[in-house]
From Swiss-Prot:
Protein EC: 2.7.7.8
Gene Ontology CC: cytosol
Organism: Nitrosococcus oceani (strain ATCC 19707 / BCRC 17464 / JCM 30415 / NCIMB 11848 / C-107)
Protein name: Polyribonucleotide nucleotidyltransferase
Biological processes annotated in GO: mRNA catabolic process; RNA processing
Keywords noted in UniProt: Cytoplasm, Magnesium, Metal-binding, Nucleotidyltransferase, RNA-binding, Transferase
Record domain S1 motif: where: 622-690
CDD domains named among the record's database cross-references: KH-I_PNPase, RNase_PH_PNPase_1, RNase_PH_PNPase_2, S1_PNPase
Subcellular location: Cytoplasm
Physiological role: Involved in mRNA degradation. Catalyzes the phosphorolysis of single-stranded polyribonucleotides processively in the 3'- to 5'-direction.
Length: 695
């Protein structure tokens, strides 16, 4: 096959899509080049579906090869290992807009693999990877509704910037990724510096408009190089089954959805489902399978709940569309942590703890674009007990990593910089109860916990999850959605921010037809909800505590002459090692002469500072020092007056009286007061006891 290439201008750079040269045994394969970043994206679909499967097994793997940046992996094995956090997050980023575009009831296994094979450290591979996944699916013949494209938007000097480089992103007040089809936005993922709703909405619309050229290029590529479409037909809907399920279960399902408690409601629904299955799926000669009946029950439940909300009725838990669940907050509840908070909203609860550490505790990220250190870490845990289940407990799953990242992005804009608060910060959110919006409960709990720890954040941050139910021209935007509303709705829309503006926005849309007006309504309603939650939070704690926990490390920061750093460190690190051991402190020195002293006790830190200042201070002529006799000689004694600085006390200067033997007056280890008489050009110090006189 002759390679086929499409080249378009996208932003201020060329985007190249090429197929037919590499990975030709895959169902679809595209090499995407943007700048000097190159990603190979492959798609493989299985023509046959496994028997008895009732879900769509789509797997997305994004992987970065270190050779892409001309590096060899660290570690003993010198090869790539388990996925990094960036790889996990990008895999989720690709998965989220693709999944809704496969046909309903399509359950064949599909795997998308995006491999970064060249990285220029300026163009993030995530956008090319998403575009490549869309193009590979369009070429593969696998049932897939329509091509999508993706764009990143920055906001620099009041202007939207399409696909900014990593260098430009350092100056941007916005990092927003949008994926969408020709007609609709499907996904938004963003972090912002407290921007207003109109700017956020404008950036989404800007991205959607700009990405149309990419969708057109993918269509042209598929027309020229696409494989024949699979001969796949959706299973015929059983109208008789729908009628039978409705007849047996509609009234009971409506009753079950009047139960306000999540666990009681789920128990009632489980009993209902089992009852319907038993009545419609006899052991012998059954017309329908168990899976078919359960699917029909799910469709019935979805229709009932959606219709009740769209007709202006109460939601599952009795609220109206804009109401927020009851909020309970407490802070400082964990006595030994540096900061803590318990945030409860309805049946969702987050226990958050903050730990302050030294620079050595920062997380080292060995990314292909270069190594960096992260001072602010946020980890989200979702144990099985929070939803009343048993399950595996171990390393974090993709969902936990993704939710933690969203919460972190929500707080990044308000966390103080290193100059104003030199501590490393780690926050852990334990989801102890969950019924929807646990990531946004984490945002609220983290803001409270940081303030409880005395971290001077710029402003409190609250988060809220919004939902949407839409049927033709009717729609309802729901505030603070439950887990069931997320499952049965058409949109999951999470917004976090301060009173000033938005700090993070995440949106996943399952249907076409979400207009700009609907998004504007959702943002406006989210703003009202956010303000209400912030008000509740401010009633408990509205500003960071002035005093940190007594168990938090104390920090002293000061500057010394950079030329004196070697004196503080000493030969082979001996001086600084002795200093830290004797004072019980941790000392970090930066090349510019900044000294950071961390200690459990304030007095220990002050003592360490005094000793560092002694080491770097210059000997002053005429000043009296308290020194220690280090060596006795026939002609006098050497006295240490500052760490690493000795002076000669001549025998004639030991006393006003005549001294015959130095040992008659002095012994090694004696502490005596001496006055500096002179420092010669060679730095030699001459001392005297006699010159002190009556001083």
């Amino acid at each position: 096959m002759t390679p086929i290439k499409k080249v378009i201008e996208y932003g201020d750079r060329s985007l190249v899509l090429e197929t037919g040269c590499i990975a030709r045994q895959a169902s679809g394969a595209v090499v995407v080049r943007y700048g000097e970043t190159v990603v190979l994206v492959t798609v493989v679909g299985m023509k046959e579906a496994a028997e008895g499967r009732d879900f769509f097994p789509l797997t997305v793997n994004y992987q970065e090869r270190t050779y892409a940046a001309g590096k060899i992996p660290g570690g003993f094995f010198k090869r790539e290992g388990r996925p990094t956090e960036k790889e996990t997050l990008t895999s989720r980023l690709i998965d989220r807009p693709l999944r809704p575009l496969f046909p309903k009831n399509f359950i064949n296994e599909v795997q998308v693999i995006a491999t970064v094979i060249s990285s220029d450290s300026e163009n993030d591979p995530d956008i090319p990877s998403l575009i490549g996944a869309s193009a590979a699916l369009a070429l593969s013949g696998i049932p897939f509704t329509t091509p999508i494209a993706a764009a990143r938007v920055g906001y620099i000097d009041g202007q939207y910037v399409l696909n900014p480089t990593l260098g430009q992103m350092e100056k941007s007040a916005l990092d927003l990724v949008v994926a969408g089809t020709e007609k609709a936005v499907l996904m938004v993922e963003s972090e912002a510096q407290e921007l207003p709703e109109e700017i956020m909405l404008g950036s989404v619309m800007f991205a959607h408009q700009e990405m149309q050229v990419v969708i057109q290029a993918i269509r042209e590529l598929a027309e020229e190089a696409g494989k024949p479409a699979w001969d796949w037909k959706p299973p015929i809907e059983e109208e008789d089954l729908k009628s039978a399920v409705q007849e047996v279960g509609e009234a009971r399902a409506q009753e079950a959805y009047q139960i306000r408690s999540k666990q009681e409601r789920q128990a009632s629904l489980a009993e209902l489902r089992n009852s319907i299955v038993e009545s419609l799926v006899p052991e012998e000669n059954s017309r329908w399978s168990r899976e078919q009946v359960l699917e029909a029950i799910g469709a019935l439940e979805k229709r009932l709940v959606r219709e009740q909300i769209l007709s202006g009725g109460e939601r599952i838990d009795g609220r109206d569309a804009t109401a927020i669940r009851p909020i309970n907050i407490s802070t400082g509840l964990l006595p030994r942590t540096h900061g803590s908070a318990l945030f409860t909203r309805g049946e969702t609860q987050s226990l958050v703890a903050t730990t302050l550490g030294t620079e050595r505790d920062a997380q080292v990220i060995d990314a292909i674009e270069g190594e960096r250190r992260e001072r602010f870490m946020l980890h989200y845990n979702f144990p099985p007990y929070c939803v009343g289940e048993t399950g595996f407990v171990g390393s974090p799953k993709r969902r936990e990593i993704g939710h933690g990242r969203l919460a972190k992005r929500s707080l990044n804009g308000v966390v103080p910089d290193e100059e104003s608060f030199p501590y490393v910060i780690r926050v852990v959110s334990e989801i102890t109860e969950s019924n929807g919006s646990s990531s946004m409960a984490t945002v609220c709990g983290t803001s409270l916990s940081l303030m409880d720890a005395g971290v001077p954040i710029k402003a409190p941050v609250a988060g809220i999850a919004m939902g949407l139910i839409k049927e033709k021209d009717r729609f309802a935007v729901l505030s603070d959605i439950l887990g069931d509303e997320d499952h049965l709705g058409d949109m999951d829309f999470k917004v976090a921010g301060t009173e000033k503006g938005i700090t993070a926005l995440q949106m996943d849309i399952k249907i076409d037809g979400i207009t700009e007006e609907i998004m504007r309504t959702a943002l406006s309603q989210a703003r009202e909800g956010r303000f209400y939650i912030l008000q509740k939070m401010n009633e408990i704690i509205s500003t960071p505590r002035q005093e940190m926990s007594e168990y938090a490390p104390r920090m002293i920061v000061f500057k010394i002459n950079p030329e004196k750093i070697r004196d503080v460190i000493g030969k082979g690190g001996a001086t600084i090692r002795a200093l830290t051991e004797e004072t019980g402190t941790t000392i970090d020195i930066v090349d510019d002469g900044t000294v950071k002293i961390f200690s459990a006790d304030k007095a220990d830190g002050q003592e360490a500072k005094r000793r560092v200042e002694e080491i770097v201070s210059d000997v002053e002529v005429g000043k009296i020092y308290e020194g220690r006799v280090s060596r006795l000689m026939d002609f006098g004694a050497f006295v240490t007056i500052l760490p690493g600085k000795d002076g000669l006390l001549h025998i004639s200067q030991i006393s006003a009286e005549r001294v015959k033997n130095v040992s008659d007056k002095l012994s090694e280890g004696d502490v005596i007061r001496v006055k500096v008489l002179e420092v010669d050009k060679q730095g030699r110090v001459r001392l005297s006891v006699k010159a002190i006189g009556n001083e």
